[in-house]
Design a protein with these regions (language model features):
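His/Asp/Glu-enriched, well-ordered alpha-helical/loop segment
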Residues: 51-58, 100-184
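Short, surface-exposed loop/helix-turn segments at secondary-structure junctions
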Residues: 186-193
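Nucleotide-sugar donor-binding loop of glycosyltransferases
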Residues: 27, 86, 182-184
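Short glycine-rich, flexible loops that bind phosphorylated cofactors or substrates
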Residues: 69, 90-91, 119, 188
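Short secondary-structure boundary/hinge segments and terminal tails
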Residues: 33-34, 92-93, 120-121, 191
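Short, acidic/turn-prone active-site loops that include or flank metal/cofactor-
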Residues: 29, 86-90, 115-117
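Histidine/acidic residue-rich metal-binding segments in metalloenzymes
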Residues: 1-81, 93-109, 129
Length: 193
């Protein structure tokens, strides 16, 4: 919202309706962005974009660091994905996304890296670690973020967020892109699950 005019956003919404397609946007990454949107339109970025019909066909929000309960309602109502980018948000001091809140509210979360201009290390293992670690810090609870849930965010949910329905799980007839990890290496120990 912060880099586009209302007129341009209305055109995006019109196109989304014409093609019946989801819209993905960087949303509520910084407090400044949220405050400026509220000053301009009297609403948070998710509420403003929703008022334009932007998410009538679903989609998602990148970052989603500074959100309200009403924003969560927008995400739920439109079956949107939140794509968290913890490395970028850490580098730019944007804040910590409330991932545990999204999980509690059954809003699907995927993990992204943003881009090289705002993240020096486009490494999904690092991003998974940051999702886990930062969530624990934010929640003040070492058990607040389940490792298997984070793995799902980085794999299944990422594929679903991109509508790669033929590459979301390992199954006959689906596409696969695999890596092998040697769990016997010292840095992989101990294994708890």
């Amino acid at each position: 919202e912060y880099t586009c005019s209302k007129e341009l956003l209305c055109k995006v919404s019109e196109m989304a309706h014409h093609y019946r397609t989801p819209v993905y946007a960087h949303i509520s990454e910084t407090e400044k962005e949220v405050e400026e949107c509220k000053a301009r339109y009297g609403m948070t970025p998710p509420m403003f974009l929703d008022s334009l019909g932007m998410f009538d066909y679903g989609g998602g929000g990148f970052h989603c660091v500074h959100v309200t309960d009403q924003d969560l309602d927008v995400f739920r109502r439109h079956h949107m994905y939140v794509i968290t980018n913890p490395g970028s948000n850490t580098k730019l001091a944007s804040g910590i996304a409330p991932i545990a809140d999204y999980v509690r509210h059954k809003i699907p979360v995927a993990i992204g890296t943003d881009g090289p201009a705002s993240n020096n290390c486009l490494d999904m293992f690092r991003e998974m670690f940051l999702v886990t670690g930062l969530s624990k810090l934010l929640e003040k609870d070492a058990a607040s973020m389940d490792a298997m849930e984070v793995l799902k965010m980085a794999t299944v949910n990422g594929a679903k967020a991109m509508r790669l329905n033929r590459a979301d799980i390992l199954a006959k007839g689906k596409y696969a892109d695999l890596i092998m990890i040697d769990l016997h290496q010292p840095n992989m120990q101990p294994i708890h699950n």
